[in-house]
């Protein structure tokens, strides 16, 4: 069942027919394909290219096909080359020869470019909504657990932060992701419909009308570019990859924090699994799967970049390979965002263990150095003094705040009784611009 064949003497081989067909995956575009056809038919009527009664028959047929697909009456299957062929041939079977006028002034090249842009817009809006839900949960859980905890560099305890502030760092990452996606939406918001195969059409079609009807800002400026452009797919998968990178970083920390070695958090049962042999195990499989799925999205990005490399203008069949990477990347990032939101919104925070870890890591050493600076010592000298204090504490298995004033004075006469108040963890986190961390 093909939309072409008049210039061929021999039938396409079954092997080639199966190899060439994209229906198994581009069937996802049925809604966009039909909506694009509806807009195209309305424009053809407005421009007196087809008659009003022909428009009504075609529109009725398209709406019926859409309804039958949505209700599961019409299955998207069979020996069709693609979703465009499926819709058009079913339309002709339903309403007769008038259905053959649907494709007037249009090519599958601008048709598929339109379908993919419409689908990309819808998909991006879905991802943005998932990002917003995750960001809301990060804020909510952070506000509910504004506890002091260790901050890390090199995975070594470094300085005091709060659990809330740590989560807000991820909020900032996802906020940037949202902005990147919104920017991508603005760039792709041009309609390729009317570009034809590559050189427009001899019909006096109204591209402005269809662009507006389909929710685009404007039609594309160049027909060749309109059917050849897949930059937006590359850009979106790239942005999905950055989202996945952020999710993998958060996943890694959740996995570490939930381990027996940290015990900072407990991941809810709803997002954990067990072991088939070890009865005691509770595994953070949700976070681990998110961490692992980054590879497939990175792979999708490399796939589409490779497809588009060195392609001459205009459309080439290689571009059929743009869909599966995009579909996979979009589905993966949405599922990962939803699972991460579930993990965050249901986790439990162990306040006591957070504080125990704070006290074990000399996390007030920088504040102790700042104390000496405030007393008149140069920072580099203060840095050396406190480094020596830390060595002394390690030998004694003690914390800085547990040393007596006499012990501290062995390292500098500048130490006074007020050192203890200055390096208190809860006090120090509210000094200077540290107040911006919002500990209360």
From Swiss-Prot:
Pathway: Amino-acid biosynthesis; L-arginine biosynthesis; L-arginine from L-ornithine and carbamoyl phosphate: step 3/3
UniProt keyword list: Amino-acid biosynthesis, Arginine biosynthesis, Cytoplasm, Lyase
Gene Ontology BP terms: arginine biosynthetic process via ornithine; L-arginine biosynthetic process
Subcellular location(s) per record: Cytoplasm
Family from the record: Belongs to the lyase 1 family. Argininosuccinate lyase subfamily.
Protein name: Argininosuccinate lyase
EC numbers on record: 4.3.2.1
Catalyzed reaction equations: 2-(N(omega)-L-arginino)succinate = fumarate + L-arginine
InterPro entries linked to this entry: Arg_succ_lyase_C, Argininosuccinate_lyase, Fumarase/histidase_N, Fumarate_lyase_CS, Fumarate_lyase_fam, Fumarate_lyase_N, L-Aspartase-like
A matching Pfam family: ASL_C2
Keyword Isomerase among UniProt keywords: no
Predominant cellular place of this UniProt entry's protein: cytoplasm
């Amino acid at each position: 069942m093909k939309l072409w064949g008049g210039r061929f003497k021999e039938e396409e081989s079954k092997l080639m027919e199966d190899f060439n067909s994209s229906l198994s995956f581009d069937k996802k575009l049925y809604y966009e394909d039909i909506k694009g056809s509806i807009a195209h038919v309305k424009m053809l009527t407005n421009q007196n290219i087809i008659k009003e009664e022909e428009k009504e028959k075609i529109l009725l047929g398209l709406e019926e096909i859409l309804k039958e697909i949505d209700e599961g009456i019409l299955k998207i299957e069979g020996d069709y080359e693609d979703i465009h062929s499926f819709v058009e041939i079913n339309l002709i079977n339903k309403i007769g020869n008038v259905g053959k006028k649907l494709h007037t002034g249009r090519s599958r090249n601008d048709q598929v470019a339109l379908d993919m842009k419409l689908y990309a817009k819808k998909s991006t809006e879905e991802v943005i909504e998932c990002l917003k839900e995750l960001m809301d949960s990060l804020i909510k859980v952070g506000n509910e657990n504004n506890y002091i905890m260790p901050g890390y560099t090199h995975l070594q305890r470094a300085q005091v932060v709060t659990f809330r502030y740590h989560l807000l760092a991820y909020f900032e990452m996802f906020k940037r992701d949202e902005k990147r996606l919104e920017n991508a939406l603005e760039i792709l918001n041009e309609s390729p419909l009317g570009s034809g195969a590559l050189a427009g059409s001899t019909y006096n079609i109204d591209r402005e009308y269809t662009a507006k009807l389909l929710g685009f800002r404007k039609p594309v400026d160049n027909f060749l570019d309109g059917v050849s452009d897949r930059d937006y797919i590359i850009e979106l998968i790239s942005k999905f990859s950055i989202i996945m990178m952020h999710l993998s970083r958060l996943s890694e920390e959740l996995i570490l924090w939930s381990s027996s070695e940290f015990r900072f958090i407990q991941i809810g049962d709803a997002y954990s699994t067990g072991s088939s042999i070890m009865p005691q195990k509770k595994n953070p499989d949700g976070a681990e799967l998110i961490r692992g799925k980054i590879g497939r999205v990175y792979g999708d990005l490399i796939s589409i970049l490779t497809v588009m490399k060195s392609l001459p203008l205009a459309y080439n069949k290689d571009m059929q390979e743009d869909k599966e990477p995009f579909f996979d990347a979009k589905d993966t990032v949405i599922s990962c965002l939803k699972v991460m939101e579930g993990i965050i919104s249901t986790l439990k925070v162990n306040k006591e263990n957070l504080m125990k870890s704070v006290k074990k890591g000399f996390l007030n050493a920088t504040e102790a150095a700042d104390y000496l600076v405030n007393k008149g010592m140069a920072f580099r000298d203060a840095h050396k003094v406190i480094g020596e204090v830390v060595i002394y504490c390690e030998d004694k298995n003690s914390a800085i705040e547990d040393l007596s004033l006499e012990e501290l004075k062995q390292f500098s006469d500048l130490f006074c009784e007020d050192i203890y108040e200055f390096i208190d963890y809860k006090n120090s986190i509210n000094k200077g611009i540290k107040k911006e961390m919002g500990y209360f």
